[in-house]
């Protein structure tokens, strides 16, 4: 008898297998050319043949993604701490964080690439801009969500601001921070890919976005789909790893993680 946990893994795999089978059948029965829509088997063959070059490019994109995520976590967390310490500072600077978030990165990436001469750093800045806001926003909310009764109790016992931050505000904000981190993981990958599209540079330090552009120009559509598959798989792995980290950190004391463990 398959339990709920088994179905959580099995059901998506069955749906995916059914989708791929229908896709393969449709391409073969309708004789669709591979430069319009390749069959999954053609994509798998391209992934096998072009695997070394695609994986090398994926490593470049992944390096930018992880660096941007780490920078977003550190800088975003620090900004949230500053906001929690000063309401005036939050009211003054938070609107500009919103502006950065809602401005399409594809519109400002060319300027960043021009202003920042070092290519890796320019791509890192673009990915960071996309990734940092969920961490700032969520962590700020978490730091400001400490229970008022507990805050009053800390004041009653003469706790210093540092003690209140360490023993009350930070534990309260941790689930919010981890939720923002899960969101930012995917956004960092998106930002890195968009920045690579705009930069459009080849060479040894070529990211996966350039491989997609190159495949599109050459009508190597199976290779394009193979690169897209690697990007999607990378995004899923990043999310699952961050979700696992969140559950590991919270499972012994936070209700959300404890409830998930019991299911």
Predicted feature residues:
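Periplasmic/extracellular loop-to-transmembrane helix junction in inner-membrane transport proteins
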Residues: 2-3, 29-73, 210
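N-terminal signal-anchor transmembrane alpha helix
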Residues: 7-29
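Transmembrane-helix boundary motif in ABC transporter permease subunits
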Residues: 67-97
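Transmembrane alpha-helices
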Residues: 125-129, 162-195
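Short cytoplasmic-facing helical segments at TM-TM junctions of multi-pass membrane proteins
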Residues: 138-177, 212
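Hydrophobic alpha-helical transmembrane segments of polytopic membrane proteins
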Residues: 207-244
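Short cytosolic juxtamembrane segments of multi-pass membrane proteins
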Residues: 246-263
């Amino acid at each position: 008898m398959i339990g709920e946990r088994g179905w959580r893994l099995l059901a998506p795999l069955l749906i995916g297998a059914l989708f791929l089978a229908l896709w393969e059948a449709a391409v073969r029965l309708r004789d669709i050319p591979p430069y319009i829509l390749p069959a999954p088997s053609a994509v798998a063959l391209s992934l096998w043949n072009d695997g070394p070059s695609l994986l090398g490019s994926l490593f470049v994109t992944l390096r930018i993604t992880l660096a941007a995520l780490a920078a977003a976590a550190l800088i975003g967390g620090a900004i949230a701490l500053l906001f929690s310490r000063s309401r005036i500072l939050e009211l003054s600077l938070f609107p500009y964080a919103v502006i950065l978030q809602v401005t399409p990165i594809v519109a400002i990436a060319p300027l960043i690439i021009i202003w920042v001469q070092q290519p890796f750093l320019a791509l890192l800045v673009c990915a960071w801009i996309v990734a940092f806001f969920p961490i700032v926003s969520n962590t700020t909310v978490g730091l400001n969500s400490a229970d008022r009764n507990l805050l009053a109790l800390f004041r009653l016992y003469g706790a210093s601001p540092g003690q209140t931050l360490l023993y009350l505000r930070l534990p309260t904000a941790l689930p919010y921070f981890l939720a923002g981190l899960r969101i930012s993981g995917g956004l960092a990958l998106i930002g890195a890919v968009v920045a690579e599209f705009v930069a459009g540079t080849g060479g040894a330090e070529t990211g996966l976005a350039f491989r997609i552009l190159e495949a599109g120009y050459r009508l190597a559509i199976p290779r394009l789909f193979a690169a897209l598959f690697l990007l999607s798989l990378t995004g899923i792995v990043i999310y699952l790893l961050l979700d696992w980290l969140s559950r590991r950190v919270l499972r012994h004391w936070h209700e959300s993680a404890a409830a998930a463990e019991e299911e």
